[in-house]
């Protein structure tokens, strides 16, 4: 038996709003269980928050669907023996281990109650068929269902970065690391694709933040949700994933598409535009540190950007040159799975563009998941 993470998120700063604080609010997150386990612990983080945070209580229960419905075995988690937990700015806390049996394909429902004014800066936005969250006014942690009149869905996950399960030795985790493309649907579809193929001993863990770059990060609030640069997030995000064997890195497109010149955007100077060697060095940084954690690491090629709002041929060229480098490494060729070369530029294949010419469609995310599973499990490179 061993500990394996069955759920995970990166940490960033949320999109800025005049209201930075919440009071008397319940957060609820349903989590898919990929395999059976007998004990449970969760990790909460305030990694990107600059004020201390107190959570009054954290409640878990079982569920039968990706919804807010708690079905049975409702219990409080404790932190150093207390129901309440406190995190310093940029800090974290791990719950006490609890004996809690979960079956494969069940759902774990995690609810957190924020009693006093709480800085909600530290969080991340995620989407996908296995990703959902809720907030509700008042303490509804023990409610079987959240009140319809005082609750709403949200894609923002606050504080919750890891759920760890004590499980059989054959079970393990795959980490998917990246930016908005990975914070969106394909890791969830990968988990579903594994299940479709009766590969039932793998948990897919997402560690991704929209807008992140390998080499740089923003210091302004308009882009605070675009997260930390690679050297400020990579080690922190992967080192806490229990039972991980494999890492997939799909990162670098924002380094290429963001710089436009201060005449267009004061926060995006053209001097931020990386060279090919700088991008390679950034990827080598990831690979060198991944070795420390004994991870089998694959890199994902960057997907098409043709007709994106900052598209230019020089961006196309460096993207394609970077992809050629990535293909010399153990890699998953997402670019050719959902894109095609037309007149020296990669376009999305029919049905694979979400509409913004940068992010894949749901069909494309499914194809990316299939490509990832084929590569990792069928040696189909």
Where are the model-predicted features located?
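N-terminal secretory targeting modules
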Residues: 1-175, 182-183, 188, 196-199, ...
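Structured segments of extracytoplasmic/periplasmic soluble domains
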Residues: 193-197, 207, 237, 241, ...
């Amino acid at each position: 038996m061993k500990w394996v993470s069955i759920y995970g998120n990166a940490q960033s700063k949320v999109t800025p709003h005049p209201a930075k604080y919440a009071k008397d609010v319940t957060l609820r997150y349903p989590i898919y269980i990929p395999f059976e386990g007998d004990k449970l612990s969760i990790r909460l983080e305030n990694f990107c928050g600059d004020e201390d945070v107190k959570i009054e209580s954290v409640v878990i229960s079982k569920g039968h669907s990706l919804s807010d419905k708690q079905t049975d075995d409702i219990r409080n988690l404790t932190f150093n023996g207390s129901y309440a937990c406190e995190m310093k700015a940029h800090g974290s806390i791990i719950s006490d281990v609890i004996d809690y049996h979960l079956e494969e394909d069940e759902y774990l429902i995690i609810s957190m109650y924020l009693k006093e004014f709480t800085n909600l800066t530290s969080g991340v936005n995620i989407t996908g068929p296995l990703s959902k969250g809720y907030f509700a006014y008042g303490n509804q942690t023990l409610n079987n269902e959240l009140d319809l009149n005082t609750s709403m869905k949200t894609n923002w996950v606050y504080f919750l970065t890891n759920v760890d399960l004590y499980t059989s030795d054959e079970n393990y985790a795959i980490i998917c690391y990246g930016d908005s493309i990975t914070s969106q649907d394909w890791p969830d579809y990968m988990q579903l694709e594994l299940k479709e193929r009766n590969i039932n001993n793998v948990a897919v863990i997402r560690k991704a933040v929209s807008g992140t770059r390998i080499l740089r990060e923003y210091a302004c609030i308009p882009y605070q949700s675009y997260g930390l640069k690679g050297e400020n997030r990579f080690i922190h995000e992967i080192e806490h994933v229990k039972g991980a064997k494999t890492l997939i890195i799909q990162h670098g497109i924002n380094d290429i598409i963001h710089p436009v010149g201060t005449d267009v955007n004061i926060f995006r100077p053209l001097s931020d535009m990386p060279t090919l060697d700088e991008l390679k060095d950034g990827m080598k940084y990831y690979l060198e540190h991944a070795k420390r954690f004994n991870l089998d690491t694959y890199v994902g090629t960057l997907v098409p950007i043709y007709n994106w709002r900052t598209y230019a041929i020089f961006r196309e060229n460096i993207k394609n040159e970077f992809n050629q480098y990535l293909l010399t490494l153990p890699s998953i060729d997402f670019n050719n799975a959902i894109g095609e070369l037309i007149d020296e530029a990669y376009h999305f294949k029919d049905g694979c563009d979400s509409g913004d010419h940068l992010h894949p469609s749901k069909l494309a995310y499914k194809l990316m998941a299939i490509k990832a599973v084929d590569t990792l499990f069928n040696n189909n490179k």
